[in-house]
């Protein structure tokens, strides 16, 4: 016969550690379908993250600039709670949420030091997929 699950003594809930990080990096991954914002410290340890799909936007609404704005506001507020005051922004991808996510972070009162486009560009590497015909 199977044992009954143990009570609360066996379950451990990890308390969120509040770091005090003044400077960070905001990684914005803007694809055509979604926008993911991750805010890290200088070493690359994630402090907070949010995505358009995680904020309740589904389907084609995920890929809108407004969805990216909402996601970056959520990630930015969580980073401010961790003590972040200055951010470098690294944008990757061609999606529609590129600019609106940076504007939303600036509107929260976070000082933006630098904006860099780190979209990977091939030096004629792999052959691209065939052209879509509708």
UniProtKB/Swiss-Prot annotation:
GO annotation (BP), single: translation
GO MF annotation, one: structural constituent of ribosome
Keywords associated with the record: Ribonucleoprotein, Ribosomal protein, RNA-binding, rRNA-binding
One Gene Ontology CC term in the entry: ribonucleoprotein complex
Family per similarity comment: Belongs to the universal ribosomal protein uS11 family.
Subunit structure: Part of the 30S ribosomal subunit. Interacts with proteins S7 and S18. Binds to IF-3.
Reported function: Located on the platform of the 30S subunit, it bridges several disparate RNA helices of the 16S rRNA. Forms part of the Shine-Dalgarno cleft in the 70S ribosome.
PANTHER family: 40S RIBOSOMAL PROTEIN S14/30S RIBOSOMAL PROTEIN S11
Protein name: Small ribosomal subunit protein uS11
Taxonomic classification: Bacteria, Pseudomonadati, Pseudomonadota, Betaproteobacteria, Burkholderiales
Chain's gene name: rpsK
């Amino acid at each position: 016969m199977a044992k009954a699950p143990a009570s609360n003594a066996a379950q451990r809930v990890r308390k969120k550690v509040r770091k005090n990080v003044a400077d960070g990096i905001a990684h914005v991954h803007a694809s055509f379908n979604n926008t993911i914002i991750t805010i890290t410290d200088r070493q690359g340890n994630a402090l907070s993250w949010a995505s358009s799909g995680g904020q309740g936007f589904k389907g084609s609404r995920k890929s809108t600039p407004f969805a990216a704005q909402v996601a970056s506001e959520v990630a930015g507020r969580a980073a401010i709670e961790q003590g972040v005051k200055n951010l470098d922004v690294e944008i990757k991808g061609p999606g529609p949420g590129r600019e609106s996510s940076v504007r939303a972070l600036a509107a929260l009162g976070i000082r933006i030091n630098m904006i860099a486009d780190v979209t990977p560009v091939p030096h004629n590497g792999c052959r691209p997929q065939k052209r879509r015909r509708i």
